[in-house]
């Protein structure tokens, strides 16, 4: 059995409902519904969830660990939420959150407007910082990657949009 799949999930104040091949996790920040793979059994035991493979096949074993991680992320998302911080490095690079849109000035001849999907919010504490928040870990990471993709950090000066914890290794310029 997978090591990740063996460990129980603490519900941390979230409500869980199991119904016809899906699990619904409800917490103070929202609700997430996730389909459960038929090769995985889910049992609710007094504030913890236990997952186990249906049989001893490699696929069922692997999926039990995957489903455990997905459900644990859903529980964390509806109780505490997820956030990803981005930093803009470069002269004139600015960001401004307006409702469900993120306006970016990244040195192009036109401003870049990124439409936020439902369930994801963007905040700009300063003009060069972006904080993307939401309850779905996959969606928050996807939006952060899309925003970074407009102007990834270049390897010579490091200008561009980077994750706050990202280390950009700079190349040396050509010598004569």
Swiss-Prot record:
Assembly and oligomerization: Part of the 50S ribosomal subunit.
A GO cellular-component term linked to this record: cytosolic large ribosomal subunit
Alphabetized UniProt keyword annotations: Ribonucleoprotein, Ribosomal protein, RNA-binding, rRNA-binding
Entries under PROSITE patterns matching the protein: RIBOSOMAL_L6_1 (PS00525)
Upper classification of the organism: Bacteria, Pseudomonadati, Pseudomonadota, Betaproteobacteria, Burkholderiales
Name of protein: Large ribosomal subunit protein uL6
GO biological process entries: cytoplasmic translation
InterPro entries to which the protein is assigned, alphabetical: Ribosomal_uL6-like, Ribosomal_uL6-like_a/b-dom_sf, Ribosomal_uL6_a/b-dom, Ribosomal_uL6_bac-type, Ribosomal_uL6_CS
Pfam families the UniProt entry points to: Ribosomal_L6
Entry similarity comment: Belongs to the universal ribosomal protein uL6 family.
SUPFAM superfamilies per record: Ribosomal protein L6 (SSF56053)
PANTHER family attached to this UniProt entry: 60S/50S RIBOSOMAL PROTEIN L6/L9, LARGE RIBOSOMAL SUBUNIT PROTEIN UL6M
GO molecular function: rRNA binding; structural constituent of ribosome
Biological role stated in the UniProt entry: This protein binds to the 23S rRNA, and is important in its secondary structure. It is located near the subunit interface in the base of the L7/L12 stalk, and near the tRNA binding site of the peptidyltransferase center.
